[in-house]
């Protein structure tokens, strides 16, 4: 979302969600959606593009779109964009860079932190 915000010179709003925390982020658990959306410029209104990295199961994107449509009436148009859409996804985004007909594991740069604790970090960087 940050890159598209910069390219199109549009304000960025951030909504935090979490569901993949069990087994180093490989098992989907309870979906948590933040109560508030952070944005530096006014309210969420007009045309909105919801951006995520991946439509995996599709449950998170479906839930967020439902929440936005029901709680943000100033939104007049809502579209979605992702980098990857898996074939098993229950949600089809409006825009997707790559469709993955199978269910491959997408290696994300933040995965290395899933099993990292402060103690492990101190041990790793101990001099």
What are these regions (language model features)?
Residues 1-127:
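PRPP-associated nucleotide enzymes
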